[in-house]
Structure formats: C-alpha cells, structure tokens
C-alpha cells in the first residue's frame, strides 16, 4: 500500500517519511549493506542476504500493490538514510499478522527516524484493522526497548541465547507486543521483527 509522505523537523534536521518508489531501489540495496555492517542490532552481517536493485524493485512493486504491505523510506535532501517494511501473509491463519523491520544509517541515529517510521507504520496498521503489533529486539538494546514501551508495546517473552555476536557471546532476544484492542475498538495483528523483513 502507498501512503502520503510526511515531513519531520527534529534536532535541526528536516527529513521526509514516504512510501518507497521504484527509483529508490538502487539506494536501498546500497544502504542495506552499509547498515548491516554498522550495527549488530540487525540479524545480518554486511553482505548477507544481499538484495540487488532488481530485487528491491520487485519488493517495492509488491508492497505498493498489497493492502497488507507497507514500505517506507526516510529521506534527507533526496538521500535515503533509513527504511522500514511491513509484510503481511496470504495464509488465512496468518492473514491478521504483519511483520515489521526497520533500519537507519548510523550517522542519522538520534533524529527520531526509527520512531517516526514506527509511528507511521502503527498508524497505518490501525487504520487498516490490524490487531497486534509485535517485535523482537536484542535485550541489550535498551534504548529501543524503552521506545517500544513508550509506544505501547509490552514484553511478551525472552528467547534465550538467541543470537551470537562478534564477541563470541550469546544474547537474549526480547519479544514485545502491542494489542490494538487496548487502544481502540477495532483492529488486527502486526508483527515487528528487527531486521527480518529484508
């Protein structure tokens, strides 16, 4: 699905959150690799699960056409610096769910882009009768966990020793969820998974 873009002014930086279009594909392919190499908060290391320009064009086309999909980018002066994606399922038993992933270039951390992408996605999900929002986040990513709590998500469980990072140690993953029944009368289910939708 495609939504109307919105401009944000945070900490002296102006950026736009809008739906992805075909001409974004090459930039998206490049920054995805860069982001994966900048943080261990994602599931991938740099270059793993590579998606080229054509691959992103196909994803953008699908997400623009499917009612339960949403692909957003954060843009600064015509440069894409982050993106998020909601992906639904065609399976009837899973049709109420949407999986969400978000990533931002490290140099643009601290400008609320992740929050803006998440809030826009939550608003879109609520307007499209989505019932539950859930996500998975590394337990050591305390800032993200606090943000998710502020946006109405609660801890649902812990995946013990879920990820092995570069220091050779194993880290837990926190599963969080937001039930829209608590916030308004109608809705369905959205899954937020850090870095898994790409």
Q: Which sequence ranges carry the predicted segments?
A:
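Acetyl-CoA-dependent GNAT
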Residues: 48-107, 118, 179-182, 192-197
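Conserved acetyl-CoA-binding loop-helix of GNAT-fold acetyltransferases
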Residues: 104, 110-123, 127, 146-150
């Amino acid at each position: 699905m495609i939504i109307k873009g919105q401009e944000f002014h945070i900490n002296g930086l102006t950026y736009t959150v809008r739906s992805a279009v075909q001409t974004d594909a090459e930039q998206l392919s490049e920054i995805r690799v860069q982001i994966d190499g900048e943080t261990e908060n994602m599931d991938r290391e740099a270059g793993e699960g590579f998606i080229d320009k054509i691959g992103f064009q196909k994803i953008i086309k699908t997400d623009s056409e499917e009612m339960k999909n949403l692909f957003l980018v954060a843009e600064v002066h015509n440069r894409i610096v982050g993106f998020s994606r909601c992906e639904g399922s065609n399976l009837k038993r899973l049709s109420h769910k949407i999986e969400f992933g978000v990533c931002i270039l490290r140099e643009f951390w601290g400008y609320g882009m992740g929050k803006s992408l998440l809030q826009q996605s939550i608003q879109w999900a609520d307007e499209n009768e989505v019932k539950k929002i859930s996500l998975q986040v590394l337990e050591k990513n305390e800032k993200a966990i606090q943000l998710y709590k502020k946006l109405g998500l609660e801890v649902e469980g812990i995946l013990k020793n879920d990820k092995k990072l570069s220091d050779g140690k194993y880290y837990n993953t926190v599963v969080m969820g937001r039930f829209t029944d608590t916030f308004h009368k109608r809705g369905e289910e959205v899954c937020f998974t850090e870095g898994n939708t790409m």
